[in-house]
Amino acid sequence: MKKIVLAYSGGLDTSVILKWLQENYNCEVVVFTADLGQDDDMSVIRQKATALNVKEIFIEDLKEEFVKDFVFPMFRANTVYEGYYLLGTSIARPLIAKRQIEIAKLTGADTVAHGATGKGNDQIRFEFGYYCCNPNIKVIAPWRQWKLTSRNSLIEYAKKHGINVPLDKSSEPPYSIDANLLHTSYEGKSLEDPYVEPDYTILSKSVTPELASDTPEYIEISFEKGDPCAINNIPLSPANLLKQLNTIGGKHGIGIIDIVENRYVGIKSRGIYETPGGTILLHAHRAIESITLDREAAHLKDEIMPKYAKLIYNGYWWTTERKMLQALIDRSQEKVNGVVRLKLYKGSVIVVGRKSENSLYSHNLASFDLSEDYNHTDAEGFIKINSLRLRNC
């Protein structure tokens, strides 16, 4: 083993992993931190890595790439896993894995490592990504190898090796937290009883609907080829647009869900997720599609969406089948242009208007008044032909 590239967050787990790799593999460890909008202090992360004698430190701002090339393509499909989950963690892993492999090539490393546990989905997502990008890469997953099986053992290891442990990490935390620009998730510990209501003071992106503004807020989102491009007619970059929607949605208590999901490894897991901006985008995108997509095209998208969501959730972003579905989805978005008006209030996203130069909606046809383009008597033959099999059951 020549050199290892570690996906490094600067937290207790990956700081211990960093030292453990240095001790057990006797080779140089390169650290890579992806700034995906998680609001961590990147200078502190650099200081922690430097204190552990790391010579090559890569801390990269990938927020725009994350939203433009991963989040937006996913939202073109109106992607939801098991009815609720907008895949905030799942969609971040392919980008981290890709860049980790690129850094391995750049630095001459033959091995990559991650801090995902042996029970979760992330170990699969990371490693599927690694092997798709470099089939010959070596992978180290410390949580599947070492004897440190509890948080207390991690803390003891850290203290023994002079790794700084913040005071608030010296006791058992109530939740395991993952964050990026799309969402923040809370899992484990007190949430492991699915009947116990969580302490919502932990929320970082949102307030609960009870504490949300008492005044509704109206916003407009513009779309070009299925992607949002402006809020209230002000053009914004992908990352800035999502960031602004998070701020707007958060103060109205939008996008807080409490779910029990089915992990790929076969375990049911309960989580609290905050996705304010993504929830607004999902409603807005569905609304603009409702007037710009043909019925059969829209229904076909609805049919393939669960398969597409499952591929992303299970870590198959870089596969041929996901790319095939993406090509179909992207083709459907060529005329998904226009503006959607929404009302945000106490946890609700209400579509109150939509318009498009590519609209397929005909007021003349939809009206209850008589129409020259639609003869009511024509419906009789349509009904008789389509009811033939029903009358012969």
Swiss-Prot record:
Main location: cytoplasm
Keyword Transmembrane part of the UniProt annotation: no
EC number(s) recorded for this UniProt protein: 6.3.4.5
Annotated residues for binding of L-aspartate: T117, N121, D122
UniProt cross-references to InterPro entries, sorted A to Z: Arginosuc_syn_C, Arginosuc_syn_N, Arginosuc_synth, Arginosuc_synth_CS, Arginosuc_synth_type_1_subfam, AS_cat/multimer_dom_body, Rossmann-like_a/b/a_fold
Domain of life: Bacteria
Pathway connected to this protein: Amino-acid biosynthesis; L-arginine biosynthesis; L-arginine from L-ornithine and carbamoyl phosphate: step 2/3
GO CC, any one term: cytoplasm
CDD domains recorded: ASS (cd01999)
Sequence positions that bind L-citrulline: Y85, S90, N121, R125, S176, S185, E261, Y273
Signal peptide region: none
GO molecular function: argininosuccinate synthase activity; ATP binding
Enzyme's top EC category: ligase
Alphabetized SUPFAM superfamilies for the sequence: Adenine nucleotide alpha hydrolases-like, Argininosuccinate synthetase, C-terminal domain
Catalytic activity: L-citrulline + L-aspartate + ATP = 2-(N(omega)-L-arginino)succinate + AMP + diphosphate + H(+)
Single biological process term from Gene Ontology: argininosuccinate metabolic process
UniProt keyword terms in alphabetical order: Amino-acid biosynthesis, Arginine biosynthesis, ATP-binding, Cytoplasm, Ligase, Nucleotide-binding
Compartments, as annotated in UniProt: Cytoplasm
Binding site for ATP: A7, Y8, S9, G10, G11, L12, D13, T14, S15, A34, G115
Subunit structure: Homotetramer.
Family to which this protein belongs: Belongs to the argininosuccinate synthase family. Type 1 subfamily.
Protein name (database record): Argininosuccinate synthase
Organism listed in the record: Ehrlichia canis (strain Jake)
